[in-house]
């Protein structure tokens, strides 16, 4: 049952729910969630109830991501939480960009450490602060397995995140090419405009190479501070649309991993404020 609830929070399901006519398979996935609430309660309240059950009985990666985002934004409300960011040869589970930026790799009790070395190497090329998030039971193993500059956060039995070891910052591990590749073209241009007054002076086909050459001439500490500024401001319109939609707190990680139009976010918000009874299905969820 709890796995069915976890499936309802996937970005694939949530994206489908934002469409004008969600497919039957998505409605079936949501049916297990809707059944948890009084039929007249909003579907969003049912998602919050389902999430509470996941926290209590099935601490999957989604739970770790959501609690990490909530805790990070409580500490720094103006920060930006990004989910599933490609970084060098890996994909960071969560990146939080505020006054500083931190890349987080989540290892639940269902995960192995087999790829951890490569993942941490990738993140360390782009972020001063890198952390691994594990259950309390895996803290000692994580402390022994990761480099000394990598922080370790523990997810305890009360669903709180505590710091077993803070990360160690510094620019020496950063790679300018990796920083450049994480940034989008508009972000690169914004950095170069602020730093050297640059505006595009070559055809679009040559702009990547031209901006790369100019970016590499920046001092690493300057480039990194600008990198953090751009990540903090990334997808600001998306975040405004998410806030306007009034999504339930339990949807934080799903929303952070999606890019939708403003209309689609509004449609999703309307759906989650509608009665749960509309999403009860007699057929069982698809496998």
PLM regions and their residue ranges:
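A conserved mid-domain beta-alpha-beta active-site/ligand-binding segment of alpha/beta enzyme cores
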Residues: 161-235
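C-terminal, charge/polar-rich interaction regions
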Residues: 218-287
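Catalytic cores of nucleic-acid endonucleases
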Residues: 110-150, 156
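Active-site metal-binding core of divalent-cation-utilizing nuclease and nuclease-like domains
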Residues: 54-99, 146
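Short acidic-glycine loop/turn motifs at beta-strand connectors
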Residues: 98-100, 156-159, 168
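Interdomain/boundary linker segments immediately adjacent to catalytic/signaling cores
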Residues: 1-57
């Amino acid at each position: 049952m709890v796995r069915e609830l976890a499936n309802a929070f996937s970005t694939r399901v949530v994206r489908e729910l934002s469409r004008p006519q969600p497919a039957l398979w998505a409605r079936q996935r949501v049916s297990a969630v809707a059944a948890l609430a009084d039929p007249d309660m909003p579907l969003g309240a049912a998602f919050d109830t389902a999430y509470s059950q996941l926290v209590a009985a099935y601490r999957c990666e989604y739970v770790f991501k959501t609690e990490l985002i909530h805790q990070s934004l409580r500490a720094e409300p103006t920060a930006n939480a990004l989910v599933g960011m490609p970084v060098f040869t890996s994909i960071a589970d969560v990146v939080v960009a505020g006054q500083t930026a931190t890349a987080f790799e989540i290892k639940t009790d269902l995960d192995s450490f087999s790829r951890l070395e490569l993942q941490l190497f990738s993140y360390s090329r782009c972020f001063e602060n890198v952390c691994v998030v594990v259950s309390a039971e895996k803290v000692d193993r994580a402390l022994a397995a990761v480099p000394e500059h990598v922080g370790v956060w523990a997810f305890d039995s009360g669903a709180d995140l505590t710091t077993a070891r803070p990360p160690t910052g510094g620019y020496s591990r950063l790679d300018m090419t990796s920083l450049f590749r994480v940034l989008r073209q508009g972000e690169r241009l914004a950095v170069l405009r602020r730093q050297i007054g640059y505006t595009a002076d070559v055809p679009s086909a040559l702009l990547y190479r031209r901006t790369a050459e100019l970016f590499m001439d920046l001092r690493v500490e300057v480039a990194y501070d600008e990198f953090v500024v751009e990540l903090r401001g990334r997808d600001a319109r998306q975040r405004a649309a998410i806030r306007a939609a009034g999504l339930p707190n339990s949807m934080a990680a799903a929303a952070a991993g999606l890019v939708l139009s403003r209309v689609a976010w509004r449609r999703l918000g309307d759906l989650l404020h509608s009665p749960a009874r509309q999403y009860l299905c007699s057929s069982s969820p698809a496998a």
